[in-house]
Structures are given as C-alpha cells and as structure tokens.
Amino acid sequence: MRTLVAAILLSSVFLHAQTDGIWQGYDPEWSHVSRQLIALAEATPQEKFAWRPGPDVRSTSEVYMHIVIGNFYLLSVTGPKMPAELSSLDMEKTVTGKAQVIDWLQRSLDAVKTAHATAKPADLRRKVKIQGVDADVDGIYLRIIVHANEHMGQLIAYARMNGITPPWSQ
C-alpha cells in the first residue's frame, strides 16, 4: 500500500513538472532581471538619466519608461488593466526623474510578477489578440521577459559608456 501511495505521489509530481515545461523557470528569471533593472537604475546618478548616446536615440530615463510602458501594455493584453495614471505613451518623455522612473519601473515589474504568479496553466494557453494577431498568453509573457532583457543590455551599454559598473559586476 505504501508503494502505491508513493507511486501516486511521484507521478503527480512528474505530471505537474511536465505541464510547467519552460514556464517553471519564468518566475526566477523574471525576479533576476527585475533585481538587475532596479539595481542598475539605483546605481545610475540622477544626471545620467537624461543622457543619450546620440540624437534621436532614447535617453536612459526613456529606456526605463519604455520598459514600464511595454510591461503594462503587454500585460493589459493578457487581462489586467493598465494603470489609469499611465495616461499616454508620452510618459516615456515626461517621466524623467530618477525616483519617479524607479517607482514606475518597480510597479511594472511587480505587476508582471503578480500576474504571472497567479496565472494557471489554462490561463497561459488562452488565446488573445495583439495588434490584430492571435497569440497565446504564454507568448505574451515570453515577449515581456525578452523585451526586459533586450533593454537591460541597452542600459548596461549606456551605464558602461558613462563609467558606471553594473552592481552585480563589481
């Protein structure tokens, strides 16, 4: 009897692991990129938030706010509403102070973390439309994490061009 109970328990663990697939690593990876984004923003002096590598290229604050807007927009495609205060895409250009940018960044990172952590496997398989194209919710979450990492690389380059070493590299 104990063998049967053990077999049932083990099979449920393996069955659960199979349904998680790639997504079992999402939450730790999201936490990792979130910590790095916040740490890099905090390590960047206020005056460097206006820095841009050239004309017509996003400034440091604009890159962070682009991540914020992207997080909330992509998350809204999966169901949660965008914050009312996130009035327009112009916030990329109007929210430029370090404290404000970090506050918005943290809010957007937490929103993604909470939404993903509460999603059930069926939620991740649900179909949604984004810009007229069919997608699965899990594909949207993949886009969110790829987008955050893409701009993390950009922000690391900005930091290094300004003599700032990312805190995790010191």
Task: Enumerate the predicted regions with their spans.
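Residues within well-ordered alpha-helical secondary structure of globular protein domains
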Residues: 10, 43, 66-69, 107, ...
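Boundary at the C-terminal end of the N-terminal hydrophobic targeting segment
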Residues: 15-19
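Short, contiguous alpha-helical
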Residues: 27-31, 35-38, 46-90, 129-170
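Acidic/histidine-rich alpha-helical segments that form the ligand environment
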Residues: 93-128, 135-147
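Sec-dependent N-terminal signal peptides
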Residues: 3-14
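Well-ordered alpha-helical scaffold segments within catalytic/enzyme domains
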Residues: 36-41, 75, 111, 115-116
